[in-house]
Amino acid sequence: MKTSKMICAFLLVLVVGTFNDISGAYGEYVEDQHSFKIERRFPPCVEVCVQHTGNVKECEAACGE
């Protein structure tokens, strides 16, 4: 009987530890996904142009914005 209680306790600790690891990993995954979101300040045409040239006014004129 003592052995079965020890086995149950061990399995419980194992399950709780695994759950904590999985939930922690998922939390990190969610944070990473949010950090990759890019805030757009300009329309897509201007945004791409600015990434290449760095000149906002020139890009707005070229894109007709």
Curated annotation (Swiss-Prot):
Signal peptide interval: 1-27
Distribution of this protein across tissues and organs: Expressed by the venom gland.
Places the protein is found: Secreted
Principal place of residence: secreted
GO annotation, cellular component aspect: extracellular region
Assigned keywords, A-Z: Cleavage on pair of basic residues, Disulfide bond, Ion channel impairing toxin, Neurotoxin, Potassium channel impairing toxin, Secreted, Signal, Toxin, Voltage-gated potassium channel impairing toxin
Propiece span(s): 28-39
S-S bonds: C45-C63, C49-C59
MF terms in GO: potassium channel regulator activity; toxin activity
Top-rank taxon, per record: Eukaryota
Function: Potassium channel inhibitor (Kv).
Domain notes: Has the structural arrangement of two alpha-helices stabilized by disulfide bonds (CSalpha/alpha 2(S-S)).
Family stated for the protein in its record: Belongs to the short scorpion toxin superfamily. Potassium channel inhibitor kappa-KTx family. Kappa-KTx 2 subfamily.
Descriptive protein name: Potassium channel toxin kappa-KTx 2.6
Species for this entry: Opisthacanthus cayaporum
